Amino acid sequence: MGLVVKDISKTFGEKTSKTEVLKDINFEVKDGEFIILNGASGSGKTTLLTILGGLLSQTSGDVVYEGKSLFERHTNKAHLRLNDIGFIFQASHLVPYLKVLDQLTLIGKETGMSSKEAQARAKELLTKIGLEEQLNSYPHMLSGGQQQRVAIMRALMNHPKIVLADEPTASLDASRAQEVVEMIRKQIKANQMIGIMITHDESLFKYADRIVQLYDGKIKNS
């Protein structure tokens, strides 16, 4: 059924100092589809992504997933983020004192997996990205590209229905950036998830099924 963004608007401030950042945003993303959000700085991309992830409330409109408001699927937005959504950010944000395996098993346990289930799932994901020999390594022992690959698998640990990525390759060189985005796309396709990524790097557009352009808080094309 996919994800339907319906008339999402966001205004900051009050009375005379109001700023409308998003203006009646409408688009759909099908299951298994990977789209890129693009637009100049200040066009509303990150604001939109944070609303989709339940990190920020919209002023009006709704986001519908599987026929129901995304924000009503759980008792609170923390449960939404933990169970339905996987986040990938510009920086990996790995916990410095946790080993690679533990970075993932921690998420699994928080979503209700047993220790055995979480370890099995984490090892499966880390093997997919060729890091099965680094399970007991700490983040500082990995390259930047390896750290970001761990962050991607961490985002997929809870079998999310939706993956949101905000400039996940901004700190990587061109070859690593291509590798990371190809990996994100591959996982979205294989698991029929919904993928939405923000990037300014036009060389990465080829990995998207569709580009959604934002301009001044509005959809320019989709």
Curated annotation (Swiss-Prot):
InterPro entries: AAA+_ATPase, ABC_transporter-like_ATP-bd, ABC_transpr_LolD-like, MacB-like_ATP-bd, P-loop_NTPase. It is a peripheral membrane protein. It is found in: Cell membrane. It comes from the Bacteria. ATP binds at residues 39-46. Its EC number is 7.6.2.-. Its main location: membrane. The keyword Transport applies. GO terms for cellular component: plasma membrane. Keywords: ATP-binding, Cell membrane, Membrane, Nucleotide-binding, Translocase, Transport. Belongs to the ABC transporter superfamily. HrtA family. This is Putative hemin import ATP-binding protein HrtA. It comes from Staphylococcus epidermidis (strain ATCC 35984 / DSM 28319 / BCRC 17069 / CCUG 31568 / BM 3577 / RP62A). The gene is hrtA.
